[in-house]
């Protein structure tokens, strides 16, 4: 998987950098978690301050285009980004916790 930065804009008003990127890959389509980790390492940004906005994969091609945002602090990210974007666009514990909270416990499933 190779990531190429296509555009980078500083948005001072929202305390973030807006990044456009392109990914070329072979084999299976990379997951959001893989893209998030590699993009964070590439930009030297903390993972809790980076959110992936969108990923667009064209049918039949091994290329993805997308956009991401890097905030100056995690507080700004939580203040500006909607919750569903934070859960979808950030890799890590937040995704696992949301799944664990939605899953019914074993006792409740047996009682039904």
Swiss-Prot record:
SUPFAM superfamilies given in the database record: Ribosomal proteins S24e, L23 and L15e
Keywords tagged on the record: Ribonucleoprotein, Ribosomal protein
GO cellular component: ribonucleoprotein complex; ribosome
InterPro entries: Nucleotide-bd_a/b_plait_sf (IPR012677), Ribosomal_eS24 (IPR001976), Ribosomal_uL23/eL15/eS24_sf (IPR012678)
GO biological process: translation
One MF term in the entry's GO annotations: structural constituent of ribosome
Region (Disordered): 88-112
Family to which this protein belongs: Belongs to the eukaryotic ribosomal protein eS24 family.
Record-given protein name: Small ribosomal subunit protein eS24
Organism: Methanospirillum hungatei JF-1 (strain ATCC 27890 / DSM 864 / NBRC 100397 / JF-1)
């Amino acid at each position: 998987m190779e990531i190429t930065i296509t555009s980078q804009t500083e948005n001072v008003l929202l305390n973030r950098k807006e990044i456009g990127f392109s990914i070329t890959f072979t084999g299976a389509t990379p997951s959001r978690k893989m893209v998030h980790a590699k993009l964070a390492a590439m930009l030297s940004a903390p993972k809790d301050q980076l959110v992936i906005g969108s990923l667009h994969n064209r049918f039949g091609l091994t290329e993805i285009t997308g956009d991401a945002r890097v905030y100056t602090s995690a507080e700004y990210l939580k203040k500006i980004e909607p919750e569903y974007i934070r859960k979808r666009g950030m890799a890590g514990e937040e995704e696992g916790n949301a799944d664990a909270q939605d899953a019914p416990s074993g006792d409740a499933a047996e009682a039904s």
